[in-house]
């Protein structure tokens, strides 16, 4: 997840002025939440 977090930070920096920034952030947050749940199940 460290690599993913770094990619997420880079995306946020690039998307700050983009109108779809919030939508993409929500999708990434949902992805991270799903990954965390999957890890807890295992």
From Swiss-Prot:
It comes from the Eukaryota. Residues 15-26 have a biased composition (Basic and acidic residues). This is L-lactate dehydrogenase. Keywords: NAD, Oxidoreductase. It comes from Plasmodium falciparum. Its EC number is 1.1.1.27. The lineage of its organism: Eukaryota, Sar, Alveolata, Apicomplexa, Aconoidasida. Residues 15-42 are annotated as: Disordered. GO terms for molecular function: L-lactate dehydrogenase activity. Homotetramer.
């Amino acid at each position: 997840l460290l690599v993913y977090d770094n990619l997420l930070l880079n995306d946020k920096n690039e998307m700050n002025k983009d109108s779809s920034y919030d939508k993409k952030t929500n999708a990434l947050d949902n992805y991270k939440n799903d990954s965390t749940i999957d890890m807890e199940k295992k």
